[in-house]
Amino acid sequence: MTSRSSLLAGVAAIVLLSSPAFAEDAATGDTSVNNPQTSSAGTGARDDDDAIIVTARRRTETAQEVPLAISVIGGEHIDSTGAFNVGRLQQLTPTLQFYSSNPRNSAANIRGLGAPFGLTNDGIEQGVGVYVDDVYYSRAASSTFDFLDVDRIEVLRGPQGTLYGKNTTAGAINITTRKPTFDFEGTAEVSIGNLGFKQAKAAVSGPVIADKLAARLALSATSRNGTIYNVTSGNYINEQDNLGVRGQLLWEPNEDIDVTLAADFNKQNPECCGTVYVRTGPTQRPLNRQYEALAAAQGYAVVSTNAFDRLTDVDADLNAGNELGGASLRLNWNVGSGTFTSITAWRFWDWKPENDRDFTGLPIVTKSQNPSQQDQYTQEFRYSQSAKNLDFVVGAFAFHQQIDTQGTEQHGPASSRWNISPTNPLSNDPTVLDGLTAINTQQLKNTSLALYGQASWKVTDAFTIQPGVRLNYDKKSGYYDRQVFDGAGVPVLNGQTGARRAAQLAIFSPQSYSPEGSDWNFSYDLTLSYKIAPTVMVYGTYAKTFKSFGINQNGVPNDASGVPALAAQTVRPESVDHFEAGIKTQIWDRKATLNISAFRTDIKDYQANVTNGQFGTVRGYLANAEKVRSQGVEVDFSIRPSERFNAYVNGSYVDATYRKFVDAPCPPELSGGGTGAVIAPPGVTGNSPANCDISGQRLPGVSRWSVSVGAEGNVPANLLGKDGQVYLGVDGNHRTRFSSNPSPSAYTWVSGYNLWNVRFGFRTDAGFDIFGWVRNALDEDYFEQLNVPGGNTGLITGQPGDPRTWGATIRAAF
């Protein structure tokens, strides 16, 4: 890790120091490089022509002309604020939420919707689509990689199925990279900071054949020590170790045709991902089977009860190694008054994890890993045309995905005492569960075909009608097989008798099933927009859309008789009704922008990720919640009174709740007890309900209030004979508390927090920039999420957010 990152950092530094940007006569490059204020709507910065250009509707237009709630973040703003992945991007866009316990278990949500909170299940679609240069990335792991050579990012809020290849019910993250150029140009950047942070980026572009063939190559490497110290291994864990490379060839045989061939490769290999002890919360288990008693029985004490000591003692190997990449071929052909576009793409993802799933320093679970390999193929054809009063886009999309997973989970010598009741003599025999192993084999084949279209009819100069439709076909087939072996390698089978087998089957039960299904769905939307004035537009949208059915790829829970509940192997599709109204305004000679949107999204048969208390058997599975609603208001305000100052305030109120979920799994304080008719109070030993009614309670991971603010000021200055600007920038983000468990629990509310970032530096119009930065400047202690480990012992662990980090960046263009 260190040698690779240092090597690239050295290469980037050499390029940087040799850059003509250090010369008096350095040529000015393109605007995207040389004007650091060419950033984004909602950040107080604007393009030179006072308009933020986007392609959200598959045509080039200004963001203020799009009747849609959209945030646009320019590549320069991403670089200057250190928002180099989706996790950091959420600090700039309040209604974007990102959660990750490791690259596989990552989710991006918009307005509280998108992907269920918790462990990832390959059998469902993402509600928030991630696109890079119009190529759909089906794996949420792509959200954990560093942005590479990005020109801008558009965060589209609300359903996007009638314009995008893959149907997305909550929104889309549309990433556009910088394209090859027929003039030679390049950039180089090096950053260093505390915690051993090192990041290097470089990009070069230029002609191969004058006016016919151009190429672009970009590289990025990031490394940083972990933020949690593991006293068992002596290593800092949850480190960063990213490497990425992207190459493009642009061929323009004539004025009507351009063809782009692109390929990328990304690799991560960090020692990750662990959590820390946070607290215990009483469950309804017998007291001698709750965490304090179980730990005391084995003479175990946590290394620290203060989570922000950032200490752990997990004893299993940790690794989050994965590789992601692919290739695409894009054709744009001007045909008559329109443009035909073809995008052919292949992507892969290889996941090689190692985890500690008992979250302690005891050898309870000694191995937990689900390595996975995915291949994805997409083909999209699109035709767009713009006329005086009518613009339209029609397209066809095909998607095929195959995922193969080989899982292993193994228990150790401390498992018997931890998992078998102390009243059972077998609890004192380590050999009962030591070496007990589950081998899981999973396969998923997912095919989706779609036709879609959207038209924009300008009825008058002020009034526009925009209808859209989508016809979708989905077919999925899966396979799940779990085989169980005892410590001697003898198969453990359902129906076997004897006390030892009963204890082993209570941990792992064999199961095998092959879910499959297919479905047709029709979606549509209608948007009406009206320009009250040249810089004031109001709009309203209704969308009827869906998320395709899902299949449980991580196993299903056992029923009351201990037999796998095969009825749970599939979940119904979501049916979505979305309403939105908004106003977009610019005032003060376009120096100030104020956009307001109000929305309500009702979902029937919401695909929720729920948990049960069977230790190691099924930690999470998919189920349908009858009704869910997300509603709220978003406000984006930015101002730039002069080129010397800009500021922004983006805020949102989101009320996302289960409107009806009467048979949800219960939170830990109502779990782990007996099965009698009289239910004990929460956290009191006794009987537990089979299910809980959580109707009216909040969806996990969603803060009611979120606010992002920022400002930057600059003054003219001369440094070492170079004219430029000295600048000071501040960005802040506030989130109120949110639930961190699928069924809200008193033990897993994450408190609200405030994060402030500061940067101070000097830059020139020629593209040279040097600045120091501090992230989480006030060193706020906060959690990204809290976790409820399996077993209903009452243990709560957490993932602390980054502490204060600081460093410096030097960047140049040539």
Model-based region annotation:
Residues 250-254, 383-384, 395-399, 442-601, ...:
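Structural signature of Gram-negative outer-membrane beta-barrels, strongest in the C-terminal barrel
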Residues 330-334, 339-355, 531-550, 554, ...:
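Membrane-embedded beta-barrel scaffold of Gram-negative outer-membrane proteins
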Residues 1-81, 87-92, 255-256, 327, ...:
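N-terminal Sec signal peptide and the immediately downstream disordered periplasmic leader
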Residues 391, 595-602, 623-740, 813:
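Gram-negative outer-membrane beta-barrel transporters
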Residues 733-743, 762-814:
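C-terminal beta-signal and adjacent terminal beta-strands/loops
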Residues 46-183, 581:
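Acidic, small-polar-rich N-terminal luminal/periplasmic segments of exported/outer-membrane proteins
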